[in-house]
Design a protein with these regions (language model features):
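C-terminal segments
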Residues: 24-65, 72, 121-197
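NAD(P)-dependent aldehyde/semialdehyde dehydrogenase
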Residues: 8-11, 15-116
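Short cationic amphipathic helices and targeting signals
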Residues: 1-5, 91-94, 120-122
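Short beta-strand and adjoining strand-loop segment in the mid-core
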Residues: 2-8, 169-171
């Protein structure tokens, strides 16, 4: 889970996130959280499903109990940067980019490092940027101008099949990019009789 924001709107974004009870870590807090959340760059199993307050407390960081998301400013992606992977928790890596092209490039790198085939979200009013993003990012779902989690699982904000099991296709080593439902679990027998086409 990461958010990539154009520098031009980053201050406004940060203000809105803080108003929504998100907590931005400083450098020292980021180092503490990294040591607490990861072991050999792998997410510790006890982190998944924990509240932001409990995650921060375990790292020795004081944050308001009402915090909804911990935001971790980042610049790097890949080995040596564990926050650039999936975190299964209310912890967001935060990247500031100079323009939409760099934003798309950053999204591609994040997906390549950990998330091929899953889901990506773009908030933009520029159709050209949306199309570029959609064509380049290797995921099974592109969610446009909608909340990411509820957009990806379908039905509430779009016509995607409602599901909590999201296929990642061949990008992610799965057989489908669909939101998996009962349709994917039914065996259908096809009887084919000879005919001249």
């Amino acid at each position: 889970q990461a958010v990539i924001v154009d520098k031009e709107i980053s201050k406004e974004f940060e203000k809105l996130m803080k108003e929504a009870d998100c907590y931005f870590l400083n450098k020292e807090e980021t180092e503490k959280l990294e040591k607490s959340m990861f072991e050999n760059e792998k997410l510790k199993s006890e982190i998944a499903g924990q509240s932001p307050y409990n995650i921060a407390k375990a790292a020795g960081i004081e944050i308001p109990e009402k915090t909804k998301v911990i935001v971790v400013p980042q610049t790097g992606i890949g080995p040596g940067h564990p926050f650039s992977k999936e975190k299964l928790s209310p912890v967001l890596a935060y990247y500031i980019v100079p323009n939409s092209d760099k934003g798309i490039e950053t999204a591609e790198k994040l997906i390549e490092f950990g998330g091929l085939g899953h889901s990506a979200v773009i908030h933009s009013e520029d159709e050209e940027t949306i199309n570029k993003f959609s064509n380049r990012v290797k995921v099974g779902r592109i969610i446009v101008n909608s909340p990411s989690t509820h957009g990806a699982i379908g039905d509430i904000y779009n016509t995607n099949m409602p599901s909590l099991t999201l296929g990642c296709g061949t990008f992610g080593g799965n057989s489908t990019t669909a939101n998996v439902s009962s349709v994917n679990l039914i065996n259908i027998k096809r009887v084919a009789k000879r005919r001249v086409n």
